[in-house]
From Swiss-Prot:
Belongs to the UPF0250 family. This is UPF0250 protein BPP0168.
Amino acid sequence: MHNIPPEESLIEYPSDFPIKVMGKQHPEFAQTLTEVVLQFDPAFDPASVEMRPSKGGNYMGLTFTVRATSREQLDSLYRALHGHPMVSIVL
């Protein structure tokens, strides 16, 4: 990620912020990544995860709408998700 000074951030904190994650279909994909999200947003409601399987059923897309409290929190969450072995893409 680029180092943008906080005063130039386009996001106002706190705010609800959607994060989309894609990976190969796996029975524990949603649960495993929900646990990662909860490390950065303990108030996150796991029931709010939006799940969309790919047409072929080989991949799963998840949307987590987290309560973003700082740029550092979002950057750390993105790094944790991006580095997870089950994750192909984070948007």
